[in-house]
A protein has these predicted regions:
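Eukaryotic acidic, serine/proline-rich intrinsically disordered low-complexity regions
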Residues: 121-156
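Minor-groove-contacting beta-hairpin "wing" of winged helix-turn-helix DNA-binding domains
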Residues: 229-237
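Short alpha-helical segments that sit at the start of domains
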Residues: 153-183
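Short amphipathic alpha-helical interaction segments
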Residues: 203-219
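A short, conserved structural fragment
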Residues: 217-228
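N-terminal, charged low-complexity regulatory/assembly segments
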Residues: 1-127
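Short acidic, hydrophobic short linear motifs in intrinsically disordered regions
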Residues: 181, 189-201
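Short, amphipathic alpha-helical interaction segments positioned at domain boundaries
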Residues: 237-256
Length: 256
């Protein structure tokens, strides 16, 4: 589901990005935040630059299997080039292969044009955007100048995890399939109704999901129970407590 630019900025503020804006009241669904960033970034260059900056430092928090599935299921075709360019810029800056599978599902725009709306609407700015476009932006047919990540605009990881305790397991799991399972159980309605449904939500095979569930159950992160002929999966009290703690903390911060 899409969101307004103001709400998007509030969510990034919650994740430690230095926007002059109030923070969101709850931790964002990180993978859907990236989809909404692709939708709204053309309206605001700072959003694009700081999203790249955040992912360069904290990209391992993203559950990459789930992101790939959400791109296929929820992100409109017109915004996939924006997400592809965003993630490819992160890859170029860091050398990470974390987002390769997602990038492959995000083709370049059909027609070359400026990335940012303000430059599309003005012929002079449009010509300047084309003239000064960075090589990577030309690959995506979305002209934009080269830039350097703004590391000074980010809070440290400790700050982020204190305010978003549900992200701690993301930090532990480095965005692998187990992270996608936890994120799906937390944010996708009915994901835990069966292994088949959970596999679809994570964009992975049932066999791979089952192996990851074994690991998560051993670690006390999830529990499985039989409901009729199905095997239902849910977060344990430990994970639910982490998420509830994050919501309570946001209320205290807002009231101070």
């Amino acid at each position: 589901m899409s969101c307004t630019l103001d709400h998007l900025i509030a969510q990034w503020t919650r994740l430690g990005v230095a926007f002059s804006a109030p923070s969101a009241k709850e931790s964002p669904d990180l993978e859907r935040l990236l989809l909404n960033t692709a939708r709204r970034a053309p309206q605001n260059a700072r959003v694009f630059i700081l999203a790249v900056t955040w992912l360069c430092r904290y990209g391992d928090l993203v559950a990459r299997h789930r992101l790939k599935r959400l791109v296929a299921d929820e992100l409109e075709l017109e915004y996939r080039p924006v997400l592809g360019m965003l993630l490819a810029t992160v890859r170029e800056e860091t050398g990470t292969a974390h987002f390769n599978a997602v990038i492959r599902d995000c083709p370049p725009a059909d027609e070359a044009a400026p990335l940012f709306e303000i430059e599309r609407k003005n012929e002079k700015l449009r010509r300047l955007a084309e003239r000064h476009a960075a090589p990577i932006s030309r690959q995506w047919n979305l002209w934009a100048r080269a830039f350097r990540p703004k590391d000074e605009a980010l809070r440290p990881v400790r700050w982020i995890l204190e305010r978003n305790p549900g992200y701690r397991i993301r930090a532990d799991l480095k965005g692998d399939l187990r992270a996608s399972i936890i994120a799906a159980l937390a944010d996708d309605p009915r994901a835990g109704e069966s292994e088949v449904r959970l596999s679809r939500c994570c964009g992975a095979t049932r066999s791979a999901v089952r192996d990851s569930l074994d690991d998560l159950e051993t670690a006390g992160r999830i529990k499985r129970s039989h409901v009729g002929r199905r095997r239902r999966i849910s977060l344990t009290g430990m994970e639910l407590k982490n998420r509830a703690h994050g919501r309570r903390r946001s209320v205290r911060v807002a009231n101070n």
